[in-house]
C-alpha cells in the first residue's frame, strides 16, 4: 500500500563518479515487497524544485526497516539530494509501480538480468530474491566507462556477472548485447532495466523468449494522474499505458519502445 513518510537517512555515500548510495529507514519499508518498484522522493522541503524524483529500490530489508536507493547526480534536484546527511529526513512517497514478476522464473530455471547504467539498481533486489527461491542468476551490466561502474562485486555474490563498457575501459568493450552474444548466455527468462535503446535491442534480439522490461521515464506525479509518462500500446493510435502505475515493468511487446 502506498504511503508517505519522513524517512531518516542512515547512510549516504558516493560509490562511483556521480553515483550515490542512499540508505533510508522508516515504517514505509514494511510496504515494500516487489523488486522493481520505486519511490518518489521530495529532494527539499522548499517549493523549488517542485516535482519529486522517482528512484528505484535497490535493497529492501524489512526486518531492519531499511531500504537502499542508488541514483545519479546530474541536475538541481539530485544535487540537492546528494547533500543530505545521516540523521536528516527525506519526504518519501511509495512504494509505486508493479515490480518484476518473480513467478516468471521457477526454481532451478535460469534467469538473465540485464542492466544499463542507473537501470542496474532495481536488479539487485531482484537477484537476491530469485536466488533465494532457487533460480540460477546470471547478470550482465552495462556502463559508459570504468569510473561509473558500481555493484559488480555485489551482483557476483548471486551468480556469474559480466560487465560491458562502451569505451572498453572495464570488462567487454561494447554493449550488454555484445556480452550476451559473445558468451552465448542461455536463459529461460530475461529481466532488464535501462535506457530505451538497450531495452529495444533486447526485445528484438529475443522475440521468442520470455522478457520483462523496466522502463525509465520522467514522471510528474508518480501515481497515474498527470499522464507525463505514458507509452503507446502496439497497433493502436489512441491506447496508452502509464509507466508509473501500469509499469514500470512490462512484458516485451506490451508497449512501444
Swiss-Prot record:
Protein residues bound to FAD: 53-56, 70-72, 77-78
PROSITE patterns, per the entry: FAD_FR
Cofactor note (record): Binds 1 [2Fe-2S] cluster per subunit. Binds 1 FAD per subunit.
Any one Pfam family match given in the protein's UniProt record, by short name: DHODB_Fe-S_bind
Keyword Iron-sulfur carried by entry: yes
Domain FAD-binding FR-type: 2-102
Pathway info: Pyrimidine metabolism; UMP biosynthesis via de novo pathway; orotate from (S)-dihydroorotate (NAD(+) route): step 1/1
Annotated positions binding [2Fe-2S] cluster: 221, 226, 229, 244
Assembly: Heterotetramer of 2 PyrK and 2 PyrD type B subunits.
Protein name: Dihydroorotate dehydrogenase B (NAD(+)), electron transfer subunit
Amino acid at each position: 500500500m502506498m504511503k508517505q513518510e519522513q524517512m531518516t537517512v542512515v547512510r549516504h555515500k558516493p560509490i562511483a563518479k556521480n553515483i550515490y548510495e542512499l540508505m533510508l529507514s522508516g515504517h514505509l519499508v514494511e510496504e515494500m515487497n516487489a523488486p522493481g518498484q520505486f519511490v518518489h522522493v521530495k529532494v527539499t522541503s522548499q517549493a523549488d524544485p517542485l516535482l519529486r524524483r522517482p528512484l528505484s529500490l535497490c535493497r529492501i530489508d524489512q526486518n531492519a526497516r531499511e531500504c537502499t536507493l542508488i541514483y545519479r547526480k546530474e541536475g538541481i534536484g539530485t544535487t540537492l539530494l546528494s547533500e543530505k546527511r545521516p540523521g536528516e529526513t527525506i519526504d518519501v512517497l511509495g512504494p509505486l509501480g508493479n515490480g518484476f514478476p518473480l513467478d516468471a522464473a521457477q526454481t532451478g530455471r535460469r534467469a538473465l538480468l540485464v542492466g544499463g547504467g542507473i537501470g542496474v539498481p532495481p536488479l539487485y533486489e531482484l537477484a537476491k530474491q530469485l536466488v533465494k527461491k532457487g533460480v540460477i542468476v546470471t547478470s550482465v551490466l552495462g556502463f559508459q566507462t570504468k569510473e561509473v561502474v558500481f555493484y559488480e562485486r555485489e551482483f557476483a555474490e548471486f551468480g556469474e556477472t559480466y560487465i560491458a563498457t562502451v569505451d572498453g575501459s572495464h570488462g567487454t568493450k561494447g554493449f550488454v548485447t555484445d556480452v550476451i552474444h559473445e558468451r552465448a548466455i542461455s536463459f529461460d527468462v530475461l529481466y532488464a532495466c535501462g535506457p530505451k535503446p538497450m531495452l529495444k535491442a533486447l526485445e528484438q534480439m529475443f522475440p521468442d523468449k520470455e522478457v520483462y522490461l523496466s522502463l525509465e521515464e520522467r514522471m510528474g506525479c508518480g501515481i497515474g494522474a498527470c499522464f507525463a509518462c505514458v507509452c503507446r500500446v502496439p497497433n493502436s493510435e489512441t491506447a496508452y499505458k502509464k509507466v508509473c502505475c501500469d509499469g514500470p515493468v512490462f512484458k516485451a511487446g506490451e508497449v512501444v519502445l
